[in-house]
C-alpha cells in the first residue's frame, strides 16, 4: 500500500519563482512532509558584485517561512559547468544551436539533484514544471501540461520511466493564471514575480556579449547560395537557421533570413522570404535519442507519432526509425520550416511525451542542407 502523505517526504526544487512556490504550497496543503531546496548552478555575480541567485534564494526563504517548511541551498556549480555549460559552448563551436534547458534537466535537476533528494530520505522530488505524470496502468508516463501555452515536456524529453517514478509535478494540471491566483490568495512573496525568460546563466545580459567572453567570434561574409555578397556577419555562432533580425541587410522586397552556414569557409548564407524553400526540410538524423519507456516501438522497426522541433511549435506527423543505440532517422509527413541542428526533437502520441533527441543533420529531397 502507498504511504500516507504525512509519511511521504517530498523535496521541492525551488527557484524563487511563482511556479515552484505554488508546487511547495500545494504539497504542504496535501499533508506531505515537504522540504524546499534551492539549487545554485551558476555563479552570476556581476561586475558590481550583485548576484541574482542571492535575490532568488531570499525569495525561497520568504516563501518557505510563509508555508512553514524547512529550506536549504545546495551547490551544483561544478556539475553544471561540466555537464551543461561545456556542452553549450561545444555545440556553439560546432555551429549548432544548443538547448541547455534540456541538458540541465537531464544531468542536473533529475539526476544530480534527484540523487541528492533521495539521499535526504525523500520519496519524491517535485518541481514547478508544467507537465504531468500518469501512474494509472502500471507504467509511468509523462503527459503534457494541461496549460498548452506553458507545457514544458519539450524540455523534459530525456527523462526515463525510472526517474519519473520518483517525480511529482504538482502544478501540471493547472493553468498558469490559476497558479498566480493560488500564490496571490496565499499571500506568497513570489505571487507577482515575473517569470524568468531565456537561458538561466545569461539572464538579462546581452547574448552576444556573454558568448564572446567564452568563445572568440570570427566575423565573415554573408552571401546568397549563388555567392552574391550581402554584407558581413559577426560570427556564425550568433545566428540560427530561420533568423531574421540582426542581419542588417537593407533594400526593398521581402525580408532576409538565415538559410545556411558553412563552418569551414565561415560563410553565413542568407535569402529572402519567410517561406523560402531553403528553409524547409523533410528529414533529420537525431542523436542522444532516449525514450521514457523502453518498449515504445512494440517490436516494430518504425514508430509513427508526432514531433516538435522547437518549443511551443505545432506538432508535426513523423516516422521514427532507430539507426543505432541512441541514433534515429526522423522522416516528416510534410516539410517543416527552420529545423535547427542542436535543438531538441521531441516525440508525442496524443497527450503522452514519448521521449526525444538532438537534431543532428537536416535533409531535403535526399540532400543534406547547409545548416551547419
UniProtKB/Swiss-Prot annotation:
Catalytic activity of the protein: S-sulfanyl-L-cysteinyl-[protein] + uridine(34) in tRNA + AH2 + ATP = 2-thiouridine(34) in tRNA + L-cysteinyl-[protein] + A + AMP + diphosphate + H(+)
Descriptive protein name: tRNA-specific 2-thiouridylase MnmA
Protein EC: 2.8.1.13
Disulfide-linked positions: 104-200
Site for Interaction with tRNA, residues: 129, 343
Region feature (Interaction with target base in tRNA): 99-101
Family stated for the protein in its record: Belongs to the MnmA/TRMU family.
Organism name: Bacillus licheniformis (strain ATCC 14580 / DSM 13 / JCM 2505 / CCUG 7422 / NBRC 12200 / NCIMB 9375 / NCTC 10341 / NRRL NRS-1264 / Gibson 46)
Keywords: ATP-binding, Cytoplasm, Disulfide bond, Nucleotide-binding, RNA-binding, Transferase, tRNA processing, tRNA-binding
Highest taxon of the lineage: Bacteria
Gene behind the chain: mnmA
tRNA-binding keyword on record: yes
Positions with a binding annotation for ATP: 13-20, 39, 128
Chain's role: Catalyzes the 2-thiolation of uridine at the wobble position (U34) of tRNA, leading to the formation of s(2)U34.
Active site: 104, 200
GO molecular function, one term: ATP binding
Keyword Disulfide bond attributed: yes
Primary residence: cytoplasm
Region feature (Interaction with tRNA): 150-152, 310-311
Xref: HAMAP family: tRNA_thiouridyl_MnmA (MF_00144)
Biological processes per GO annotation: tRNA wobble position uridine thiolation
Compartment list: Cytoplasm
Amino acid at each position: 500500500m502507498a504511504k500516507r502523505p504525512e509519511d511521504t517526504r517530498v523535496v521541492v526544487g525551488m527557484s524563487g519563482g511563482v511556479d515552484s512556490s505554488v508546487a511547495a504550497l500545494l504539497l504542504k496543503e496535501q499533508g506531505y512532509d515537504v522540504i524546499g531546496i534551492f539549487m545554485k548552478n551558476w555563479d552570476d555575480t556581476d561586475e558590481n558584485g550583485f548576484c541574482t541567485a542571492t535575490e532568488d534564494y531570499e525569495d525561497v526563504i520568504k516563501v518557505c517561512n510563509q508555508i512553514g517548511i524547512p529550506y536549504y541551498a545546495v551547490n551544483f556549480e561544478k556539475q553544471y559547468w561540466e555537464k551543461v555549460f561545456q556542452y553549450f559552448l561545444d555545440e556553439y563551436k560546432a555551429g549548432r544551436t544548443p538547448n541547455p534547458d534540456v541538458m540541465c534537466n537531464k544531468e542536473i535537476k533529475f539526476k544530480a539533484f534527484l540523487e541528492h533528494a533521495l539521499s535526504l530520505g525523500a520519496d519524491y522530488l517535485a518541481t514547478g514544471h508544467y507537465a504531468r505524470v500518469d501512474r494509472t496502468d502500471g507504467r509511468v508516463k509523462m503527459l503534457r501540461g494541461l496549460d498548452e501555452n506553458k507545457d514544458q515536456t519539450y524540455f523534459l524529453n530525456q527523462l526515463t520511466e525510472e526517474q519519473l517514478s520518483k517525480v511529482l509535478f504538482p502544478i501540471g494540471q493547472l493553468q498558469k493564471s490559476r497558479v498566480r491566483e493560488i500564490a496571490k490568495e496565499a499571500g506568497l512573496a513570489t505571487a507577482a514575480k515575473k517569470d524568468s525568460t531565456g537561458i538561466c546563466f545569461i539572464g538579462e545580459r546581452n547574448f552576444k556579449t556573454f558568448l564572446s567572453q567564452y568563445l572568440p567570434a570570427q566575423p565573415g561574409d554573408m552571401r546568397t547560395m549563388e555567392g552574391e555578397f550581402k554584407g558581413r556577419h559577426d560570427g556564425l555562432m550568433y545566428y540560427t537557421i530561420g533568423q531574421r533580425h540582426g542581419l542588417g541587410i537593407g533594400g526593398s522586397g521581402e525580408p532576409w533570413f538565415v538559410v545556411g552556414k558553412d563552418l569551414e569557409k565561415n560563410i553565413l548564407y542568407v535569402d529572402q522570404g519567410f517561406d523560402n524553400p531553403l528553409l524547409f526540410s523533410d528529414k533529420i538524423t537525431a542523436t542522444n535519442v532516449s525514450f521514457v519507456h523502453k518498449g515504445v516501438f512494440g517490436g516494430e522497426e518504425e514508430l509513427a507519432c508526432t514531433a516538435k522541433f522547437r518549443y511551443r511549435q505545432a506538432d508535426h506527423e513523423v516516422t521514427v526509425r532507430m539507426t543505432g543505440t541512441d541514433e534515429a532517422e526522423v522522416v516528416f509527413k510534410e516539410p517543416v520550416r527552420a529545423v535547427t541542428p542542436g535543438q531538441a526533437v521531441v516525440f508525442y502520441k496524443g497527450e503522452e511525451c514519448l521521449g526525444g533527441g538532438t537534431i543532428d543533420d537536416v535533409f531535403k529531397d535526399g540532400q543534406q542542407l547547409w545548416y551547419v
